[in-house]
């Protein structure tokens, strides 16, 4: 990573954003010499890899087991009890401004990102009645931290004085991969205890950061928590500002991107399950699907945790024993629930589009969809109602699902009392357990983009890359990195990638951060 090269287009407002240049090479394949590449998985990572490979002239086939693109951000049609149709999905996702590479992918079909709409705040409400807001907090560190302390009702100057400053100093200079070497053996909870982070403000760390991994913070690696603080708060000048799609995911994002890929010549094979892959004697790779065997010169596996484990386990010719053990050790986070309710009356006009919650017995956030999504707004306008979405993360494996679903509705009525008299026109409850878990001590075992085979790369939010990225941005970044690695081997230049700064933002902050290691 180097400073921004002269004349390049910076993707955000942060002048200290890092840039990763691709290996030098020719601009694209010449007609007739383009290799064939398989991309297995049609989520963000696979879409990024397929996009870049196709843009450089590779002959790409994209395999996706579901009937639509988008992976964990896919959507599907459902008919409601009132006879209308709606698009259901896995629900609210925040497209933060520092998601440079994901936003770059979306710019392929929406150069001005007009299909994303900003939400003005990221409020967090505690059951004790206090609400934290980031709307008025300065965006550039260290003023963001100072401004938050000055404005927060749950974290004040007095709390700052009780913290173990030396234990907190590593937050000021997070570096990848060094942060994992220092903190991967510690849990997120244990780190906050060491810092003496105020108990009343624990929800700030857990709801904003660690719960975003769908994980119990007692299991989550502290290195991931520090990385999240760096990406969203202490390392980036983009701030905790984000956008959301103004229509459901298929209409706003994946439909246009799928059309773009097909115009580039990509063969998109949805509804196609890849059972196994194996090296070909003459070079390249063969994939076995329900319809037969397909041959390619290279492949990107851009699968979720369970899919990656299954394909590798069924493909004995892949990798080394140590590499296969690393894949087998990839863990899945606990199950979570997304409940969407169509109600016959509106919530109060001042209710935000998104509200993080803490202390409400399992309810992690509430979204009011008509505040930002056109389809929900049209339903609400026709029916005089509202569309709300409730999330519960890290639900116990033995929990009774119907009780959890009822509990979320009860919590909604507690947080937004005006919903107590509302009739539920219809509801959908999505239970999933397919997100990666990053437990204490796991970083060194995680699979990387490069594999023992030069013709095979991995991508996805479970895949390790030594860059300060997480969640959807890790998926997009590893997708581009996977394509870059294959292109470099073929002598073709890949794509420039952007990240938040890879160290503390200033010499003073880096010097303070270094004190903790002495």
Language-model segments: residues:
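Extreme N-terminal leader/targeting segments of oxidoreductases
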Residues: 1-37, 55-56, 78, 508-518
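C-terminal lid/capping helical subdomain adjacent to the catalytic/cofactor pocket in oxidative enzymes
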Residues: 3-7, 27, 441-518
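Mobile amphipathic helical/loop "lid" adjacent to a hydrophobic cofactor/ligand pocket
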Residues: 10, 102-103, 107-108, 113-226
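N-terminal Rossmann-like FAD-binding beta1-loop-alpha1 element of flavoenzymes
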Residues: 32-62
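Glycine-rich FAD pyrophosphate-binding loop
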Residues: 54-81
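Conserved FAD-binding subdomain of flavin-dependent enzymes
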Residues: 81-117
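Helical element adjacent to the flavin cofactor pocket in flavoenzyme catalytic cores
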Residues: 228-290, 294-298
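C-terminal segments that line or cap access tunnels to active or ligand-binding sites in enzymes
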Residues: 296-298, 303, 307-446, 452-457, ...
């Amino acid at each position: 990573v180097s400073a921004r090269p002269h004349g390049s287009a910076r993707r955000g407002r942060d002048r200290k954003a890092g840039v990763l240049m691709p290996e030098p090479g020719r601009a694209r394949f010449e007609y007739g010499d383009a290799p064939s590449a398989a991309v297995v998985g049609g989520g963000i990572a696979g879409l990024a890899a397929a996009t870049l490979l196709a843009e450089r002239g590779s002959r790409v086939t994209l395999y996706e087991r579901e009937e639509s693109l988008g992976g964990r951000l896919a959507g599907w049609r459902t008919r409601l009890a009132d006879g209308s149709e709606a698009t259901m999905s896995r629900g609210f996702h925040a497209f933060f401004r520092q998601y440079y590479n994901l936003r770059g992918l979306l710019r392929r079909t929406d150069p001005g990102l007009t299909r994303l709409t900003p939400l003005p705040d990221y409020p967090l409400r505690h059951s004790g009645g206090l609400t934290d807001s980031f709307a008025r907090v300065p965006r550039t560190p260290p003023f963001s931290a100072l401004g938050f302390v000055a404005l927060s009702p749950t974290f004040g100057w007095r709390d700052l004085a009780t913290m173990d400053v030396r234990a907190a100093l590593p937050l000021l200079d997070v570096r990848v991969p060094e942060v994992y070497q220092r903190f991967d053996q510690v849990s997120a909870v244990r780190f906050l205890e060491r810092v003496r982070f105020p108990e009343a403000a624990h929800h700030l760390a857990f709801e904003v950061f660690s719960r975003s991994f769908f994980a119990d913070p007692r299991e989550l690696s502290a290195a991931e928590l520090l990385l999240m603080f760096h990406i969203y708060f202490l390392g980036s000048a983009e701030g905790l500002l984000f956008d959301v799609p103004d229509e459901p995911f298929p209409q706003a994002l994946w439909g246009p991107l799928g059309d773009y890929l097909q115009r580039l010549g990509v063969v998109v094979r949805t509804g196609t399950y890849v059972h196994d892959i194996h090296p070909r004697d003459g070079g390249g790779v063969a994939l076995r699907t329900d319809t037969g065997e397909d041959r390619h010169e290279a492949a990107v596996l851009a699968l979720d945790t369970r899919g990656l484990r299954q394909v590798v386990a069924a493909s004995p010719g892949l990798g080394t024993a140590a590499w296969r053990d690393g894949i087998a050790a990839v863990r899945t986070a606990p199950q979570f629930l997304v409940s969407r309710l169509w109600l016959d009356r509106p919530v109060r006009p001042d209710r935000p589009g998104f509200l993080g919650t803490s202390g409400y017995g399992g309810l992690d956030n509430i979204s009011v969809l008509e505040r930002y999504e056109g389809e929900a707004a049209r339903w609400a306008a026709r029916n005089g109602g509202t569309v709300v979405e409730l999330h519960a993360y890290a639900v116990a494996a033995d929990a009774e699902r119907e009780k959890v679903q009822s509990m979320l509705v009860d919590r909604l009525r507690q947080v937004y009392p005006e919903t107590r008299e509302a009739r539920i026109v219809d509801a959908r409850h999505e239970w999933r357990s397919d997100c990666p878990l990053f437990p204490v001590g796991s970083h060194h075992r995680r699979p990387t983009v490069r594999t023992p085979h030069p013709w095979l790369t991995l991508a996805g939010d479970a895949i390790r890359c030594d860059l300060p990225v997480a969640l959807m941005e890790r998926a997009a970044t590893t997708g581009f990195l996977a394509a870059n690695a294959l292109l470099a081997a073929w002598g073709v230049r890949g794509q420039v990638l952007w990240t938040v700064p890879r160290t503390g933002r200033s010499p003073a902050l880096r010097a303070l951060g270094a004190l903790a290691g002495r």
